[in-house]
Amino acid sequence: MPKMKTKKSAAKRFRVRPGGTVKRGQAFKRHILTKKSTKNKRHLRGTATVHETNMGHMAQMLPFAGL
């Protein structure tokens, strides 16, 4: 069986919280911000949580995260 490896791109983008949920950054805030309203950009600040339907993929990408 091959060695399990962590997907480094995922390890840099996600953090596992103590409760087992995964924290992620918001999308749609890197460029083309002039057409977005101030309210829309304000709501894109901060972080969000990965949805339960994607947690299986997270466990595959981060095998040592304890998910």
UniProtKB/Swiss-Prot annotation:
MF terms in GO: structural constituent of ribosome
Superkingdom of origin organism: Bacteria
Keywords: Ribonucleoprotein, Ribosomal protein
Start-end of Basic residues biased regions: 1-16
HAMAP family in alphabetical order: Ribosomal_bL35 (MF_00514)
Similarity comment: family membership: Belongs to the bacterial ribosomal protein bL35 family.
Source organism per UniProt: Methylibium petroleiphilum (strain ATCC BAA-1232 / LMG 22953 / PM1)
SUPFAM superfamilies referenced in this protein's UniProt entry, alphabetically: L35p-like
InterPro entries referenced in this protein's UniProt entry, alphabetically: Ribosomal_bL35, Ribosomal_bL35-like, Ribosomal_bL35_CS, Ribosomal_bL35_sf
Region (Disordered) residue spans: 1-22
GO aspect biological process, one term: translation
Protein name as catalogued: Large ribosomal subunit protein bL35
Cellular component per GO, a single term: cytosolic large ribosomal subunit
Keyword Ribosomal protein: yes
